[in-house]
A protein has these predicted regions:
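Short, conserved loop/helix-junction motifs that constitute active-site signature segments
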Residues: 77, 96-98, 174
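A conserved beta-strand element that flanks and buttresses the S-adenosyl-L-methionine
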Residues: 140-145, 149
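A short acidic, Gly/Pro-enriched loop at the edge of an enzyme's catalytic core
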Residues: 128-139
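A short glycine-rich, Lys/Arg-flanked "PGG" loop and its adjoining helix->strand segment in the class I
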Residues: 157-175
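N-terminal accessory regions of S-adenosyl-L-methionine
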Residues: 1-82, 93, 192-210, 214-250, ...
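Class I SAM-dependent methyltransferase SAM/SAH-binding core
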Residues: 82-130
């Protein structure tokens, strides 16, 4: 018998702890199949070991919460003429927006699909000669800028590429345009090659003189969404108590 196991992205201790239960249950259902018929033949093993004790749907996560919040804000501002997204999730935020308006998506990674209301272009937002100046009046970049310059998705290694990306996005947006922006927040650091984590104080300096902050929301360490948070000195100083949270800014270009 050919015995192939596919386990992807799973910590070793999880595998060692939960795999015996998986094998026991596999033997049990094989025995049931022998007695009840073999309408479904068994193929390779595909263990899913981490989901048994999770809440249904996995909804309370950074992406799920930010995607819904920002899509709702764009829906309320639907009078804006051209929305462009930079690197956000196609199967989350972009899909939400495409349900009620057209959206242009720019990403360093390629895509092969044809979906109504989504227009894709492969582009590197950290290119020094990036064009499209004053191109749109609505722009989003959700949980993407933290990857700039770290090579995770085939992009170049450059310690300061988040600054290049910031400048290119600023040039792309028209004056008075809306910018919806999110990144991980907490003590400032790089966890190579996954992502950067930004302190809130750094982000405020990062945007100073470029944008007015219309609202700030965040997802905390317990995956709770707090909307319209006040950016007071104490909260900014301790990153709203986050080690790895998600800061979500609604901005207007000056």
């Amino acid at each position: 018998m050919r015995f192939m196991i596919s386990v992807k992205g799973m910590p070793c201790f999880v595998f060692l702890k939960k795999f015996p239960t998986f094998l026991r249950e596999y033997a049990e259902i094989r025995a049931q199949a022998e007695k009840m018929g073999k309408d479904f033949p068994f193929a390779k093993l595909y263990p899913c070991l981490e989901e048994r004790n999770e809440e249904s749907g996995g909804g309370a996560e950074h992406y799920f919460l930010q995607d819904l919040l920002v899509a709702q804000k764009i829906f309320q501002m639907n009078r804006l003429s051209r929305h462009v997204d930079i690197g956000s999730r196609i199967d989350g935020f972009v899909g939400h927006v495409a349900s009620f308006r057209e959206v242009e998506v720019f990403d360093v990674r390629g895509q092969n699909f044809d979906i109504a209301n989504i227009h894709f272009a492969m582009a590197d937002l950290t290119a020094e000669d990036f064009s499209f100046v004053d191109y749109c009046d609505s722009l989003s970049c959700l949980h993407a800028m933290e990857h700039f310059g770290l090579g995770r998705y085939g992009n170049r290694l450059n310690y300061r590429d988040h600054l290049v990306g910031r400048d290119n996005m600023f040039r792309r947006l028209k004056q008075g345009g809306k910018f919806y922006f999110s990144v991980p927040i907490g003590e400032q650091r790089i966890e190579f090659n996954a992502h950067r984590v930004f302190s809130v104080a750094y982000l405020l300096r990062f945007m100073e003189g470029r944008y007015d902050i219309d609202s700030f929301s965040y997802v905390d360490n317990k995956n709770r969404l707090i909307t319209n948070a006040v950016l007071d000195e104490r909260s900014v100083g301790n990153n709203f108590g986050c080690h790895y949270g998600c800061g979500i800014f609604e901005l207007t270009k000056r």
